[in-house]
Amino acid sequence: SGNSNNFTVAGGTLTKSEDCPSDVFNTFNRNLGNNLVPGFTFSNGNNTVAFATPANDSWGFSNLGAFSGKYYAEFKAAAFSANTHYIGVKFFTGIMSTDNFSNTIFLRFAKTGNTNAIYSGFTGGFLQQNMTSLSAGDIIGVAVDIDNGTVQFYVNGATYGNQVTGQASNFAGKQLQFAIFG
């Protein structure tokens, strides 16, 4: 700098770390969504969300969004209530103004039965149904490629259902946020 505030390495190697994703965590934003209280209880720095029973049709959204690129998030289903829950992605055309199922791709799951399905808010219907049940402790992964218009769900590291494809025009110009509903 102009004031001779220059830094030197005393030992070891200096590593330039621009664009390094380490220690950047996308957490839930308790200021987005509707009916956050009593619908959800946030803890662990907004990395843990517990659904109330009933959850009162509450939404929760991630605090970081994106318009292009590839993204992956994992959710641990620590426990199930009797409610039906949804985990997936929602695409916004601007500042969030509505909390509805339009512009979504969701994995729907419940405590009992084979009601698990992949839902599209772009078409207003189920893309895949009668999927195998989940268990408490399962890790649900969501991989999204915004540019190529794909979404793939995972359970405990294995693909769960078929990849959702052909969504590039639906995703274009919209901001992705990971979302939960219950």
Place the predicted regions along the sequence by residue.
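PRY/SPRY (B30.2) beta-sandwich protein-interaction domains
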Residues: S1-G182
